[in-house]
Structures are given as C-alpha cells and as structure tokens.
C-alpha cells in the first residue's frame, strides 16, 4: 500500500511540474485564510483605488497599520509566488509565478515609495499607494491557486482511486494453518493469504483453494463479475465477491499489476508529446510578451497622461493578468486525466504520441486468433489416413507433440485427448517451425505437425475436398506428417468474439478499414472475415509477413494500427504507427506496443480511438482557451480599450488570471471515455 501511495504521489507531482508551485499545494488554503485576517483591515483602512469613500475607517496613525500589515501580507501571503518566481528564474524558465512576483513586488515597492512621499516628503499633493490592490491581489491569487490545485488534483482522480485499492493488511495463512494479520509490506511471493467475501484482494496471485466471483471493475474496467476457480489468476485490488478463497502470492510491490500500471502511466505523463512541447514553448515566450507589453503600456500612458499612478496600475495589471500557466497546463491536465481514465478501464497508454496519431489512422490490422476470435478451440474432426493407425492413435501422436506447446491450438488438442481418455507420451527434440507448426521424436520416429501451406509448398498429397469442406465451416486444420507422408489430420473450430462484429462496424463508420492478418488457411480466414464484414484479408502468413504487409501499406502514405499479441507480434507492433497489445492480462510491462489492452475485448480498440478523439478535442479546446485568453486579456489590461471606458484593475486582472487556469482544469476534468 505504501508503494502504491508513493507511486500516486510521484505521479501527482509529475503532472503539476509545469506550475512551479506543486510543493506549495498544501499551503494555499492555510495561507489564504491567514492572509484574509491581515487583508481585511488593509482593505477597510485604505482608499479604494485612490477613491475616498463616504465612510472612512481611519484614525491617526492608521497608515502605519496599513504599512505593517501590508508588509506582513507581502512576505507571508506572497511567499509562494516570490519563491516560485525565484525557482523559475533559477531554471531559466520564467513563467506565471515570475509574472505574479513582479506584479506584487512592483505594487509593494511603489506603495513604500508613496508612503514615504506622503509622510516624510515636503512635496505637495498626495501620492496614491497600491496597498488595497496588493491585499486583494494576493488574496485572489491564493484563492485561485487553492481552487486550481484541487482541480488539477482531480484530473488524475481515476489513478488516485487505483492507488487506494490495495488494503493496508492481509490475513496470512501460516505453515501450521493458523491465520495472522500482517502488513502488506510483509507479504512475500509464495505466501498464502486468505480473502473473505467483500474484501479487497491484497496482491496478485493464484487461487489455491475455493471459488468465487471477482469484481475487477476498478482495476481493469471489466464491468461484469468474473468467475474464478482454483488455479485461476486474481489481481491485487480487485474485490472478492462471494466465497472465502486462499490465494498464493505471485507478485508483490513493484511487480504487482497496479504498481506496473501506475508506473507506466506515470512514465507516459512525464514523456512530452509534440503538441505539449509546442505549448511549453509558447508559454515560455508569453512571459517575455507580457513584460514587454507591460513596460510599453507604462511608457505610453506616461506619455499620454503623465499620471504615474494610472501608468503603474496598467503595468501591474498586465503582469498579473497574463497567464502562461493556462497554456502550460492545457495539455498536461488533459493527459493526466486521459491516461488515468484509460488505466482505470484497462487501456494503458505507454506512448502518448499514439493518442495524437490515432486521429489519422487509415487501417487497423488484426490477428485473427485471440483478437477477433476467442482462441478457445474445440476439436471438431480428427482422422487417420494410414490403415495401420487408428484415429485415436493419430490423436495421441498429435497430443504428444502438442503437449510441449502453449499455443491455443495445442492446448485444445491436449485437453481433448484427456477428455477422450487417449494417452500420450512425452516427445523428444521438439522444435518449433515458425509459421508452420512443430516437429519432434516419438518412439525414435520423426513427426511433424504442419498447416496446409506446408503441404502445398512441398507438394505432399492430401484430401483436398475434405480440407475445403472443413475449412469452409471455419475450422483450422493441422496435418501430421511422417517420412514426408500425410498420415492424419485434425480440425479445430474457434468462436468469434461477441464484440468483434460491432468493433468492425464501428471502425468502418469512422472510415477506418479493418484488415485481417492470420497464419491460418485462406478458407477459414475468409469464412471468419465474411461473418465479421472484413473485406481485406491476408491469410497463410509467416510471422515476418505481417511486418512487411504493414510496411507496404505505410509506403502508400497510410497510417496503420496493428492489434495483436504483445510478445508473438512484437515486430509488427513496433513497425506499425500504433501498436496495440491485446489481452496482456497482468503482464502489462513485458509487452511491446504503444497501447496495452488488459482485456481481450475487441471493443477496447474502439474505446481507445474514442478516448483519443475526446482527449485531442479537450487539448485543442484548452490550447485555444489558453492562447485566446492571453491574446485578448493582455491588451485589455494594457488599456487598449481605455478610450471607451473599459479599464481593468489589478484585482480584476488577478481574478481573470485565476479563472483562466481553473477553467482549463475543469475542462480537462470533464473528459470522459464515452
């Protein structure tokens, strides 16, 4: 739990680094209320913007009270901005904090000068001070930043919730059978923990006793409860719905699923996309723009009116109204929100550039088995082509060779042989034949399991009519070869996933062409494609063929997304403009791919595209607001419309500046997946 909270803390700091004041977060609320106590007397005892009100709360020496309280307020309430500005200058990245620090410093220093002139100088006339403006300015800035920091924190709320899923303690089953409550940090791999109904599962693990239904909605976004039996994996942070289970711990701390996800999200939030680099650059220039406009406005108004009070007010207002912060946070806040929402729903964004590229995708290429289909095969037909070998003997030979493989087709054959009580042996020297099958020794005889492409390539005879009949029914067909003779075959069917058809329809509605890439035979590939509505099919592919096909499509200027197994399809995922590893489960860190889909649900492909579209829309809105606000507000503050009576005071400027950032934060917070 400590680790997860630390991960969240680090993540939170990372998406606030643009502000230059993340470390003042906890102080803004306290500083605001303490500063309010000092500010109220200043506001009551000072003339409002140089205007003597009908009611005056003054007394002999009250100007000294104002001076002392203003000095305390300047150094106490203004400290976050003064130290923030100092930090920005030290890193040679002056921004919003520097502008605010300049604004309040100019107001304070000039007010000291005015105090001296009014109380110790023999000069006639009254010099207006800015103590009232200084007090309201600091108050508004503190309040604005307090509200803003809350809004910024909420942007990553989904990730914060994930960090809080793990319990602080767990019930450990000791070697003697006794139960003992221990801290999560004391749990080790291979320990046995007991989890009762309704409790949060403390770590990733395997159920060794009991069965239950698990609520993974807060961990992977899976809305339905998942039935779990003995030997099934469970994820730390998910909720045990019913029944007491005992879980053997498989991963703790940094190796746990939640920690991996938060680590990946944290990394993604720290990596800057091209759009963010651009906005950072513009925000950097905005500081110099504001300072130049402020100085020019001061000079111009001095030339026009020869009124130092009014000219200085323009300068201070320009400095406090300019907000590079709104521009600097425009993208990071949306990123924090989108990556958090994605992780909460089992869509882990490892490469943020992919969110921008997703807007321009022309083709989505998908592996058939496991992506479009369940990958849970059933044996529909098996047959011997050799008179002295029975059908069950052929099944036994298939199962013997396949017992060394973890491919879905292999697992299906082994399970089927067991269900038929057909015995099989451990083969020797088993080797994988890439894109074909495998070979090995059984009773000193060499056998090969191949696909139909291998038979055609080596001109081996087989029953073409039987193949066509079974393949058109959607079966994947494997052949058994001994001494370059086909001695048997097995046909296995796979179910199309419920959400595949809708996913294909959604892609087509977005003018994105779905493409099937498969090592399976043409007949099966086209049968599945026809049912799904996919017209672009590439079958009987070797692993390296997928990568070259992607390359061909890209050579025509197309943007290609590849969806496949994060390990077996790694070269293709890397070659594509966006690589999506589907069905990663808890192994989110080991997969290739820009995007990791924890579940094997094809609809998550569309969910990612939707999230990308929504994210980019929010980014554009925030950038327009951040840039547009400054383009309009800075000239107004300089007095561009003073000739029609529109003049902004420093206090109003401070309100607008604070609001500009809060609006950006709130807009980011309204980002949704759907």
UniProtKB/Swiss-Prot annotation:
Q: What CDD domains does this protein's entry cite?
A: P-type_ATPase_Cu-like (cd07552)
The subcellular location is:
Cell membrane
What the entry lists under Pfam families is as follows: E1-E2_ATPase, Hydrolase
**Gene3D superfamilies in UniProt:** Calcium-transporting ATPase, cytoplasmic domain N, Calcium-transporting ATPase, cytoplasmic transduction domain A, HAD superfamily/HAD-like
What terms describe the molecular function in GO for this protein? ATP binding; ATP hydrolysis activity; copper ion binding; P-type divalent copper transporter activity; P-type monovalent copper transporter activity
Provide the residue span(s) of the region labelled Disordered: 1-22
Mind telling me which NCBIfam families this protein's record contains? ATPase-IB1_Cu (TIGR01511), ATPase-IB_hvy (TIGR01525), ATPase_P-type (TIGR01494)
Which family, according to UniProt? Belongs to the cation transport ATPase (P-type) (TC 3.A.3) family. Type IB subfamily.
Q: What is this protein called?
A: Probable copper-transporting P-type ATPase B
Per the UniProt record, the source organism is: Staphylococcus epidermidis (strain ATCC 12228 / FDA PCI 1200)
Q: What gene is it encoded by?
A: copB
